[in-house]
Amino acid sequence: MMKHILFIFITALFLSTSNSFSQSTEAFFKTADSFFKTYVSNGKVDYKSIEKNPEQLNELLDQAANISVSISEAKEYQAFWINAYNLAVIKGVIDNYPIDSPLDKDGFFDSIKYNLGGTSLTLNDIENKKLRAQFDEPRFHFVLVCGAKSCPPIIAEAYKPSALEKQLQEQTVKALNNPSFIKVSENEVSISEIFKWYNEDFVKNEQTEIGFINQFRKEKIPSNFKVSYYPYNWQLNQK
């Protein structure tokens, strides 16, 4: 009898914990979606308005600090950390606003730490340890937005588990078909330094950079074109 009661108690506790976890992440994605819809448009962030009213951003980061996501739930895990990264970038800008570039603040990516997902970590930690080290997913580079003009554009919605595959694909296709991001000229293509910094993510299994890009392009780039990298514009992606 006691074993039966104990089993029921443990089961109820597990279900209660699972429901609480689900509700906390659901609330985070919903609040994040509202935030991005309010302060992002045309790939730019309205930092001035956020600085005047930082309450929603701070509330989101407080929520994110206490959320635990499991890597076994891959889409939820990825969506959480992508949103957490983009929100932390905005927080870093707001904490030092006004600035012309995230690089104006020393250690913006590799020293300043944020309490997210139950741990303290930098922006580089999120990108490299929480995401790149765990998943073979080069499309992350087109949704993690570093706060600079040369970054792929930030979207006016949260990344959500149920829509993540579609969102990753759409943002990658959008970036790689954008003539300002992939600059094709006669016999040459000039591409973002992202492809140089994270080259190993794009050239696996003997694939070339052009080969990777062509998977997502409507107008294919000839494989014999010369590849160069244009300078990264680190000016703030400000609305």
PLM feature spans:
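Positively charged n-region of N-terminal signal peptides that target proteins for export
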Residues: M1-I5
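Bacterial N-terminal signal peptides
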Residues: F7-T17
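Sec/Tat signal peptide C-region and signal peptidase I cleavage site
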Residues: S18-S22
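Interaction/scaffold regions that mediate signaling and macromolecular assembly across diverse proteins
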Residues: S24-K239
